[in-house]
Amino acid sequence: MKRRKKALCALALCLLLIAAVFLLGLGGAQKTWEDLPYTLLEFEGGRAIDLAQGGSYGEMNRGPGLTLPAGEYRLKWAIDGDGDNVIRITSGNGAAANPAEIPVTAGSGEGSCLFTLDRAAENVQIRVDFASGTRIDVRDMRLYSPMYRDGAFAFALLAAGAYALYVLHLYGRLGPKARGRLILVGMAVLIASGPALKNTIGIGHDTTFHLVRLCNLADGLAHGQFPVRAGGYAFNGYGAITSVFYPDVFLYIPAMMMNLGASLPFAVNAFFVAVNALSAAAMYVSAKRIFREEWAAVCASILYTLSIYRISDVFTRYAFGEMTAMVFLPLFLLGLYEVVWGEKRSWPLLGASAACIFLSHMLSTVICALTAVGVCALFIVRIIREGRILPIAKACAAAGLLCAFQLVPFITYSLEGIGAQELAKDPAFYALHPAQLFLLGAGELSGDPADWRLSTFALEIGLPLIMGAGIALYAAAAREAADTQTKKKDGFAVLLVCAGVLFAVMATTLFPWSHVRVLTRGLSDYLQFPWRFLMMTAALFALAGGYGLAVYARGHGEQMAAAVLAVAALCALPTLTDEARNNHFIAFGETVSPNWQYTEYTLPGTKTAATLDPGVRADEGVELAQVERDGLAFRAQVRAADGGEIALPLFGYDGYRAELDGQALAWTAGEDNRLTVKLPAGADGELRVYFAGKALWRAAEGVSLLTAAGLAAMALLRKRKESGADKR
């Protein structure tokens, strides 16, 4: 009880300090673009123009060409002139600045003005228009971003980490040996997080796609959706339903951080660090539970955290979904182990981890499902003999019910013909040559040599994992005498290595992908890249390697773990260094362009170029007044004596509702797939259009919520029973 009181007091103090930092406005950061006339503005005729020397009127410059998030900005200038001139602010995607024109009066010299961007603006132009007088000289111009709260969030995260360590210490979980193990694993996390410890986001393979997903999610949250189905950031405000087809449950935290004042680079980099830390923790817990050996858990955690495929997922591919799925992959393997070989009452772990993987990345779910089916088929006799079919069925049911809130909208839109068919690829074309698995760093790949993404990043198992797996085999083969439990551990480690080898083979040209494509009638194309199977190889080899290295250490676990850390870090650092030095990035104060060109998960026939028109179109005879927009919602006063149509700058996805003074109106996806409202004759009142979703979706959300609550209650009751048994 005393420990609980101390923990609660520490929690209260931690929350109080965090609240104080935010309320006092501490830790703010602002981006300043200084000396714009000398850096980002291009003056065709020079910064100074004199009519007496042959100069002429007109816009003097172009630039800075920034992509800026919505918000309030301050512009300062020092412009000498004897006439009244104008600074004009525009964007390349139709986002409006208010005011869009700033007067510069004769003889004013220096001045400043606040302006607001109503939404994210691509290719922002701040142009000086020499409109009157005989001379002008643009001496200086500076742009100030909104104030971001990155420092406050950094303090909050550090305070939360310190509190977690204090609680572990308070409950006796952080003794001298535990501290040593934590330091070694923490070093692996720190090294793996190197490229995230800066205020920029490197541009990788899928950076743009996933950052727009994140910003779209943040927009949906900011405008009251929960869970988010559609957001109004993508496609220049026309909206996207990526949250339905690409689960983003675990992106809610960085999205909420952004809505509370964090910059995009800070939120994303904090997410990457969290992914690394949680991946390390998940592998540690799983290896310790399976092998009952602390140093096996430490070595496995280090191997997994610094595995080259996982690191490439984070910092080369920027594969938000797959990297998040790899957080839960060790827990999935642990759950599968328990249900098939261990404590079959642990089926909730298998169900919950499978659900978390699905809610991270659907393709990773397919790989995990294939793994589970293969294991069950291989050990079907054992499963039937020991009565393990029911726990497996319960795990499957739990996973399905937990994901119902995501599955039901997904199925709804899929039945309407929305999907990502254009992303399907022939897996045989992208299979690796076997030699690639044994390289260090980027190597030559099969496929189109013009595809730079496939020729400039590491697609391999990695030396540390290969050595770990090899030593696991050696430890099992060279052991002369062992008890039954040790033999079981050795056998399971060998099984893990064999499974990892199989998945590695599936990533290469050795696997008959052409035949698989025929047998599955093209369904295998949705896997896109066979080298995705290396994610499973990394997890399996890390588990087996951690155990083998701990056995091979022969009582010198500390030294072995330190050696594993050194070797794994040395093999990972070349890739980490390249990514940290990436000179293509999104800087602090900037954002990703909302002018999205991807057409997956859109209505058939969508043309992204049409989204550059942000205007509302109305038929002749339809009067509009007081038009207001809030995310994906529109309000306006309308009058149409003879009826008519209004086309809004929104894609007409199923789930919108149109009302005139509270009465439902019909709408359709019209020209350019715009949401087009049909007004009846004599319409006169307030038009309201908003994304409401469907009642069936709400029912599915209730099912998932009740399932999660039930599993949590089961876990709590089980823990209390075990605690009571220990006391007796």
Q: For each predicted feature, which ranges?
A:
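Membrane-embedded transmembrane-helix bundle of lipid-linked glycan/lipid transferases
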Residues: 2-27, 144-583, 689-728
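Glycan-recognition and processing domains
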Residues: 6-72, 90, 95-99, 132-134, ...
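Extra-cytoplasmic beta-strand recognition segments
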Residues: 62-83, 113, 141, 658
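Active-site-proximal, structured, solvent-exposed surfaces of multi-pass membrane proteins
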Residues: 69, 610-728
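Extended, low-complexity, turn-rich repeat/linker tracts enriched in Gly/Pro/Ser/Thr and Asp/Glu
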Residues: 79-87, 132-135, 654-655
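Extracellular carbohydrate recognition and processing domains
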Residues: 94-121
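Short beta-strand-plus-loop segments that form exposed binding edges in beta-rich domains
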Residues: 126-134, 691-693
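Extracytoplasmic
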Residues: 191-194, 214, 218, 568-625, ...
